[in-house]
Amino acid sequence: MSKKFALTAEQRASFEKNGFIGPFDAYSPEEMKETWKRTRLRLLDRSAAAYQDLDAISGGTNIANYDRHLDDDFLASHICRPEICDRVESILGPNVLCWRTEFFPKYPGDEGTDWHQADTFANASGKPQIIWPENEEFGGTITVWTAFTDANIANGCLQFIPGTQNSMNYDETKRMTYEPDANNSVVKDGVRRGFFGYDYRQLQIDENWKPDEASAVPMQMKAGQFIIFWSTLMHASYPHSGESQEMRMGFASRYVPSFVHVYPDSDHIEEYGGRISLEKYGAVQVIGDETPEYNRLVTHTTRGKKFEAV
């Protein structure tokens, strides 16, 4: 059966060529701004969050932003929206998991994010977090990045280098050093950049290689819009210039076919200066109903809301 929001043949061809497609509308700007205002306050209550570890919520660690869809009703509905999932199904097929979500705030004066690619997501932890079967040619995850606020060049929108999704410039088996004071806001080719306490250049296969920033395109979006891209696409973000005192907020939901092994042989995640137990973790089946037993699923949030698969 044809899905209402499925990618057209032209959109599919564009995605295969460039590694991204969009932006598309999930909400009106007014609806998103009002919803985010309420959600932001509600998220301050972490009593039902899947990760209660003190290490996860101390300081400004990026890991504290993981997987709030597991306890928040709006985010639980968001990851299952047909506007998103119909298009993801066009790419990944009839059985799909949402295996992670995370917030990406950018405050006035914040640095831009380093150019990077992610395949197994071992980049910060040193241990693969998703593994595709050996007979599959490709890895990575589909990221759906939704603008919860307006995102523009001045406040730090995303940047993509089209067509870079099929070749990795980084080796995720290398290790990066977590040194926030040293690595954040380093000027790289004239732009202040960092990677949440790491320097992503430490993973480069060729230490003399530089991204082709002349080919980069900005992804300016209105609140309520989303973009779809391969995590293996070269992507970064601009610094927040401080011209506005409003933060920029993005929410990333990450999707893989259900046969991809999520968190293999792992009972915790340790990265970005934090550590969290996976005791209450489960991936969410957002499309279809077939998933191998090696992937642990959850059907409801920690507050009892059912995830509605498409």
UniProtKB/Swiss-Prot annotation:
Residues annotated to bind Fe cation: 116, 235
Residues involved in 2-oxoglutarate binding: 113-116, 145, 235, 248, 254
Enzyme class: oxidoreductase
Record text on cofactor binding: Binds 1 Fe(2+) ion.
One Gene Ontology MF term: iron ion binding
Domain of life: Bacteria
Cofactor: Fe(2+)
Catalytic reactions on record: L-threonyl-[peptidyl-carrier protein] + chloride + 2-oxoglutarate + O2 + H(+) = 4-chloro-L-threonyl-[peptidyl-carrier protein] + succinate + CO2 + H2O
This protein's UniProt keywords: Iron, Metal-binding, Oxidoreductase
N-terminal signal peptide: none
Matching Pfam families: PhyH
Keyword Oxidoreductase part of the UniProt annotation: yes
Role: Involved in the biosynthesis of syringomycin E, a cyclic lipodepsinonapeptide toxin with phytotoxic activity. Catalyzes the chlorination of L-Thr to 4-Cl-L-Thr when the amino acid is tethered via a thioester linkage to a covalently bound phosphopantetheine cofactor of the carrier protein SyrB1 (L-Thr-S-SyrB1), in a reaction that requires oxygen, chloride ions, ferrous iron and 2-oxoglutarate. In vitro, can catalyze tandem chlorinations at the gamma-position of the threonyl-S-protein substrate.
Family (UniProt): Belongs to the PhyH family.
NCBIfam families per the UniProt record, alphabetical: chlorin-enz
PANTHER family: ECTOINE DIOXYGENASE, PHYTANOYL-COA DIOXYGENASE DOMAIN CONTAINING 1
Record's protein name: L-threonyl-[L-threonyl-carrier protein] 4-chlorinase
Organism: Pseudomonas syringae pv. syringae
Taxonomic path: Bacteria, Pseudomonadati, Pseudomonadota, Gammaproteobacteria, Pseudomonadales
Originating gene: syrB2
